[in-house]
Amino acid sequence: MMAYVEMFKRDKKRFKYNLNALNENPLGVAALSGTSFNIDRNFTTKKLNFSKPTDNSIDTVSDRDFVLDFLYACSACSIHISRIAEEFIIWNSDAYNLIHLNDKIVTGSSIMPQRKNPDPLEYLRGKTGSSFGNLFSMLTILKGLPLSYFCLLYTSPSPRD
């Protein structure tokens, strides 16, 4: 189990990295190349509790790395969730009988009434694959995206996928 603790620690680091990467002040970059308004970006950075202002306005509106970083973090975490769910399924099986799942979270079999199906674990294991698809979809969308803002991201995967 301690191996999974280490995996989830790495996942936590990945999500923290995502938060830190987003902690830059975009105020004043406008839709492409900045604004003619006299904005003190260092002042607004301090007031809004950002770590620093973004460095390049075109990169700021064009950047989608944060989406990829987040989706990768979700995918890596999903792998670990899937793996531990599989471990619990195996450990709960009659062959191993190392753990016992509470009757409140298992379902019976229509053919074998004594059988207890670990449906929540199987659901977790199966559902984690959608995060890989979301990451691959976003990689495909972003591969040819030119600089600046484009509506192409509206075709990105739904959070419910």
Outline where the language-model segments fall.
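Internal glycine-rich alpha/beta core junctions
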Residues: 1-144
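Short, solvent-exposed helix-loop connector elements
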Residues: 147-153
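Conserved small/polar residues in nucleotide/adenosyl-binding loops
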Residues: 154-161
